[in-house]
């Protein structure tokens, strides 16, 4: 794969954020590229890394033909982890998903693990290992994207994955999913740190306007979230920046070493919260001994602009408003947010009629890192008590 070499970067304490890199060519061999402004990641290295990377697919009541396309597009070497929060009654959409996955396995013999987010075996496992952050007042796993991601990460850790990548199940272009996974691998191969995150910036998000396709560059929520993340950085460096372009990147990946030391927020705030947390915790040289290896190696965040456009399911205006509120809430409640930044966020949310005059954004609910969870014990409890766990080739 040929990519623009990362030239400009923003350094915030131990965190390095690389400027967005465009994919120039999807597939290359080992020949050297005699140009310093281009990075060459040979296909052999990418394919070697894919076997060490689990792809997590959180889903909830998605169209089955979209799910089918996404699964078929994930490179064969990658273990697939499906965490579904779909209906199990009236109608039982989860059963339909299981049937689809069984058929997919029979055709491909891909490595797949599948589980339902509300499986009582999961709740029991979390309770017994003392990780109650993910449970609601009734002792069940909460419904939320962040919760599904944590379940996926633990399953990935249980099978020994060194890298994890997330892809959404509502993608209309299966070929783009194949690219996303290879983009993740390219990002990891460019990194010099064991603590690395790769976030994707879609080249375009096409919309149907007046009967034709309009290839829009930015999503509505992304544009606003990125603006405030950049302000958060700028107010502490005293230099204006536009470095962050992936604040709401649902398609992102990280090394397991990074994933297991990070707390995660619930719902749609999860992706911007990842950035906010890294800036808060590793943006200053404080309490270094707790994470000495992390501070020594540094954290690298790569942003890669995809070759493919991104078509996904339109979930309506209310969904957009909720995403915007929860995304900006993470920045508003950050320890790094200044009073002037908070005021700008409040004005923006009120202008969009998302908050009333005297309201504040809700404080995000944050779940502890998974590092201290005894993974073998957790997995054994899940296997012994699960109603929905399926394992193929794993």
Curated annotation (Swiss-Prot):
Name recorded for this polypeptide: Mannosyl-3-phosphoglycerate synthase
Enzyme kind, highest EC tier: transferase
Coiled-coil region(s): none
Its EC number(s): 2.4.1.217
Cellular localization per UniProt: Cytoplasm
Keywords (A to Z) from UniProt: Cytoplasm, Glycosyltransferase, Transferase
UniProt function note: Transfers a mannosyl group from GDP-mannose to phosphoglycerate to form mannosyl-3-phosphoglycerate (MPG).
The species this protein was found in: Pyrococcus abyssi (strain GE5 / Orsay)
Gene: mngA
Metabolic or biological pathway, per its Swiss-Prot or TrEMBL entry: Carbohydrate biosynthesis; 2-(alpha-D-mannosyl)-D-glycerate biosynthesis; 2-(alpha-D-mannosyl)-D-glycerate from GDP-alpha-D-mannose (MPG route): step 1/2
UniProt cross-references to InterPro entries, sorted A to Z: Nucleotide-diphossugar_trans (IPR029044), Osmo_MPG_synth (IPR012812)
UniProt GO MF annotations: mannosyl-3-phosphoglycerate synthase activity
Pfam families named in the record: Osmo_MPGsynth
Major site of localization recorded for this protein: cytoplasm
GO CC terms of this entry: cytoplasm
Protein family per UniProt: Belongs to the glycosyltransferase 2 family.
The reaction(s) this protein catalyses: (2R)-3-phosphoglycerate + GDP-alpha-D-mannose = 2-O-(alpha-D-mannosyl)-3-phosphoglycerate + GDP + H(+)
Biological process according to GO: mannosylglycerate biosynthetic process
């Amino acid at each position: 794969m040929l990519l623009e070499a990362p030239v400009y970067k923003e350094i915030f304490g131990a965190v390095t954020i690389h400027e967005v890199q465009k994919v120039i060519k999807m597939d290359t061999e080992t020949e050297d590229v005699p140009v310093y402004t281009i990075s060459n990641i040979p296909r052999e290295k990418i394919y070697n890394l894919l076997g060490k990377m689990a792809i997590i697919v959180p889903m909830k009541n998605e169209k089955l033909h979209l799910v089918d396309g996404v699964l078929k597009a994930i490179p064969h070497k990658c273990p697939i982890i499906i965490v579904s929060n779909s209906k199990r009654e009236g109608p039982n959409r989860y059963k339909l998903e299981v049937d689809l996955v069984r058929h997919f396995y029979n055709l491909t013999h891909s490595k797949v693990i599948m589980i339902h987010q509300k499986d009582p075996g999961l709740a029991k496992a979390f309770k017994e290992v003392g990780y109650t952050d993910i449970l609601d007042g009734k002792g069940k796993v909460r419904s939320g994207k962040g919760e599904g991601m944590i379940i996926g990460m633990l399953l990935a850790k249980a099978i020994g994955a060194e890298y994890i990548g997330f892809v959404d199940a509502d993608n209309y272009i299966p070929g783009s999913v194949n690219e996303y996974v290879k983009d993740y691998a390219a990002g990891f191969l460019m990194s010099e740190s064991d603590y690395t995150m790769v976030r994707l910036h879609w080249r375009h998000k096409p919309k149907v306007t007046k009967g034709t396709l309009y290839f829009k560059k930015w999503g509505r929520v992304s544009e606003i979230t990125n603006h405030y993340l950049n302000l958060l950085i700028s107010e502490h460096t005293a230099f204006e920046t536009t470095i962050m372009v992936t604040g709401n990147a649902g398609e992102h990946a990280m090394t397991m070493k990074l994933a297991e030391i990070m707390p995660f927020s619930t719902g749609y705030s999860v992706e911007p919260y990842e950035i906010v947390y890294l800036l808060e915790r590793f943006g200053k040289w404080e309490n270094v001994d707790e994470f000495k290896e992390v501070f020594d190696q540094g954290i690298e965040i790569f942003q890669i602009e995809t070759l493919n456009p991104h078509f996904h399911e339109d979930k309506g205006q209310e969904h957009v408003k909720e995403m915007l509120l929860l995304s900006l809430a993470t920045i508003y409640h950050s320890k790094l947010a200044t009073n002037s930044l908070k005021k700008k966020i409040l004005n923006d949310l009120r202008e969009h009629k998302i908050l009333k005059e005297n309201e504040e954004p809700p404080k995000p609910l944050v779940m502890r890192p998974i590092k201290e969870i005894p993974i073998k014990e957790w997995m054994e409890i899940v296997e012994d008590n699960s109603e929905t766990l399926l394992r193929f080739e794993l």
